């Protein structure tokens, strides 16, 4: 580890903002852990990545889905019968807005 970046006061402030109750032993442990994480991030920022092309994924991934196909349900009444709530021929769902 190079230089200390995170102080105990920083940890207390973040804990307060996040509404976390932590004791002094946790503050000391979190200070060391966060400092180690930031030291590692600092090491990564020193890497020369000018020749590395920007990517969104490390490996190529393709979406393996089928197209949606509209198909009638064999028995509409059976489906509506198991709905928690219904209104005529429709599912009734809670209002969200």
From Swiss-Prot:
It holds the Pfam family GatC. Keywords: ATP-binding, Ligase, Nucleotide-binding, Protein biosynthesis. Its EC number is 6.3.5.-. GO terms for biological process: glutaminyl-tRNAGln biosynthesis via transamidation; regulation of translational fidelity; translation. Gene3D superfamilies: Glu-tRNAGln amidotransferase C subunit, N-terminal domain. It comes from the Bacteria. It catalyses: L-glutamyl-tRNA(Gln) + L-glutamine + ATP + H2O = L-glutaminyl-tRNA(Gln) + L-glutamate + ADP + phosphate + H(+); L-aspartyl-tRNA(Asn) + L-glutamine + ATP + H2O = L-asparaginyl-tRNA(Asn) + L-glutamate + ADP + phosphate + 2 H(+). Heterotrimer of A, B and C subunits. HAMAP family: GatC (MF_00122). Allows the formation of correctly charged Asn-tRNA(Asn) or Gln-tRNA(Gln) through the transamidation of misacylated Asp-tRNA(Asn) or Glu-tRNA(Gln) in organisms which lack either or both of asparaginyl-tRNA or glutaminyl-tRNA synthetases. The reaction takes place in the presence of glutamine and ATP through an activated phospho-Asp-tRNA(Asn) or phospho-Glu-tRNA(Gln). This is Aspartyl/glutamyl-tRNA(Asn/Gln) amidotransferase subunit C. It comes from Thermosynechococcus vestitus (strain NIES-2133 / IAM M-273 / BP-1).
